[in-house]
């Protein structure tokens, strides 16, 4: 029958039993005693009362993060500022147009003679990987000052730094900025023409020049649109060979070339284009005497804050600020703002964030950006950009988005090549890429992803184009601190809930049942809830989910493995009658315990829901359970009678018998919004349930085909093969069933994200959470194998995050 709890349990129960404990309860029993002894770390969570409010430090950190939305700060680029400093006055070629930029260079040289920025120096224990960027910035600054006869002492110190650190120019362990192998040698040639005396290691210099020649040869022979744009982007490194007139076709409405101050400055030096000059004036008017590596970058900067908050699990504290950013981004998207549609990272991030937050954005603009990326300046050489585009391309909602699916495959291949080739120099980024490839967004539990994101959070994070740059949300210690505090706070609550769950299990005598040998079952049932909707205020919903999940597991065992037909019918009759004397009406000890526990659980959940909803919903929960029991009984009868249903008959029953109804539907009443009787009778409610359940059912049928075929049971796989005359192979059938599942999953996500909806968004989210659960455990061909699951559960429930680990 395959239900979500069994997905978690049955694959390798012996291994699970040997690896997991459950907490001791006040009532000692053989079951609870055996659950207590394991290798999991023992933790004592703080008392619940202490978890109800945040510390002053927590609130202060929130306040500082909220201010990020108002600043739009970016780090200054020495490299780009130096190129702006080289720009001559439009009125006199002998005078600098932007003398303040030159004064900034004079004021910002480092004691070692370089023009490094703070982010060039590692804040972790690992050495900096940005030395090539520092070399470029330093040499560009020297050239700018020398051009106008300024800072002879600064120039001498800078030249000395270059001589001492020149070996980094060919160090393959260093991160190479885009175009470095062309631009840096070109600047060295220019320095030689100016008789700047650089005593450089000849071996390293020859190696560097050979790299330049090979890169230029490759670009010349390639002749593709990608290469043409790439060469335009690094135009300042092409010198007199460059046809600047042809480059101007890439000029944007704001006058820039690629929103790059350095490229735009070089273009003005060559052509005296007034729009280029106006762009540079605009940048300096905004930032003062120095410029960033990319301008404008406001939309991307704001979206990065939103994305970091969401991925770190703390977005719920900034809902007002986030809503404002999303509304403004959507307005810019509809207007075709160049800051979005002309920048791959911004477009990918905007598309993903807007679509996942319910804004109606078509994939057309995004697809064009992805296609253009292969003819854009090095975007596919930037792993961060490729990863962002890949994440966005996963969000396929409509049947006609075939091109989006193609681009998703293409981007996935690129990331796989980067991963297998070992070319990702940042260990954090490498882990992030691996996580994205291993677990699609629809097959990753929220808490698992949040923990990984926190662990991969890089306090030295920066982006690399021609030069490196940072944003306020990159490596922000406040974001890291708040996310760790919140994660550990929620985790402590989850551990306390698990203790309560343990008591409930024993108090309901479920440990006495023979199939309770699967002691770890309830551990996993709770984990699925805590790992998907984690907020402290959702405690009642988590407990309802977990308890009903465990009950469905045990009922499924009765119908699928251990029970007699008499016991099955007796249990159904007891639920239908409800008010019965269990001492006389139950046909077995097993049924008595099951029914008593089920009744108590339904009443308990119903009472909690009554308090929130202001009306009784107990009868609805009973109906949900009866629907499941009748569907399970029908499958037993089909197998007994060797009845072959039509596919429609099978689907009609099988989506109910997959047993997600009692887990998800009662919990909807406990997440906050009011659910009226009209809502739960609406077609949208039933569509959400069916789509979610069919995803699980189809994946289960693929995985369980051989076993159920051997047991004489039918499922979607066997019916599909039969309906095709038995002439297709199981491998072909698997591909078809997987395509059905893909359609159901996309339809479900589209319905969940639909803004104009009958069912409240908080309730719809639970359907998607469960869909993610079942996809996770069927994500890999061999299933989410038990040892891996053990490790994930251990991390999510038991291992707090320690800040000193980062």
Swiss-Prot record:
Residues at which Mg(2+) 3 binds: 700, 708
Substrates-to-products reaction catalysed: ent-copalyl diphosphate = ent-atiserene + diphosphate
Tissue expression per record: Highly expressed in leaves, and, at low levels, in roots, stems and flowers.
Pathway involvement of the protein, from the record: Secondary metabolite biosynthesis; terpenoid biosynthesis
Residues bound to Mg(2+) 2: 556, 560
Location of the transit peptide in the chain: 1-75
Residue ranges of the motif DDXXD motif: 556-560
Subcellular location: Plastid, Chloroplast
Entry's Gene Ontology cellular component terms: chloroplast
UniProt remark on cofactor binding: Binds 3 Mg(2+) ions per subunit.
Residues reported to bind Mg(2+) 1: 556, 560
GO biological process, one term: miltiradiene biosynthetic process
Pfam families named among the record's database cross-references: Terpene_synth (PF01397), Terpene_synth_C (PF03936)
Keywords: Chloroplast, Lyase, Magnesium, Metal-binding, Plastid, Transit peptide
Domain notes: The Asp-Asp-Xaa-Xaa-Asp/Glu (DDXXD/E) motif is important for the catalytic activity, presumably through binding to Mg(2+).
Similarity comment: family membership: Belongs to the terpene synthase family.
Remarks, miscellaneous: Abietane diterpenoids (e.g. miltiradiene, abietatriene and ferruginol) accumulate specifically in the periderm of roots. The ent-kaurene diterpenoid oridonin, main constituent of Isodon rubescens, accumulates in leaves.
Function: Involved in the biosynthesis of ent-kaurene diterpenoids natural products such as oridonin, miltiradiene, eriocalyxin B and nezukol, known to exhibit antitumor, anti-inflammatory and antibacterial activities. Catalyzes the conversion of ent-copalyl diphosphate (ent-CPP) to ent-atiserene.
The protein's name: Ent-atiserene synthase KSL4, chloroplastic
Native source species: Isodon rubescens (Rabdosia rubescens)
